[in-house]
Swiss-Prot record:
Zn(2+) binds at residues 15, 18, 33, 36. Part of the 30S ribosomal subunit. GO terms for biological process: cytoplasmic translation. InterPro entries: Ribosomal_uS14 (IPR001209), Ribosomal_uS14_arc (IPR023676), Ribosomal_uS14_CS (IPR018271), RIbosomal_uS14_euk_arc (IPR039744), Ribosomal_uS14_sf (IPR043140). Disulfide bonds: none annotated. HAMAP family: Ribosomal_uS14_2_A. Keywords: Metal-binding, Ribonucleoprotein, Ribosomal protein, RNA-binding, rRNA-binding, Zinc. Binds 16S rRNA, required for the assembly of 30S particles. It comes from Methanosarcina acetivorans (strain ATCC 35395 / DSM 2834 / JCM 12185 / C2A). This is Small ribosomal subunit protein uS14. Its cofactor is Zn(2+). One of its GO terms (cellular component) is cytosolic small ribosomal subunit. Belongs to the universal ribosomal protein uS14 family. Zinc-binding uS14 subfamily. Binds 1 zinc ion per subunit.
Length: 50
């Protein structure tokens, strides 16, 4: 059985850090899931205002 590679849709991209496919932050070509983004956003220069 051959493995097919998905070429379009929501499951194409994955988190660079953990490989998760849900909750992906793609803005500014970050490609991190929301969990990883919250952990390292401050190190990347993002600030929380409220």
């Amino acid at each position: 059985m051959t493995e097919t590679i998905k070429k379009s849709g929501r499951g194409v991209n994955e988190c660079k850090r953990c490989g998760r496919k849900q909750g992906l932050v793609r803005k500014y070509d970050i490609y991190l899931c929301r969990h990883c983004f919250r952990e390292i956003a401050h190190e990347m220069g993002f600030e929380k205002y409220s």
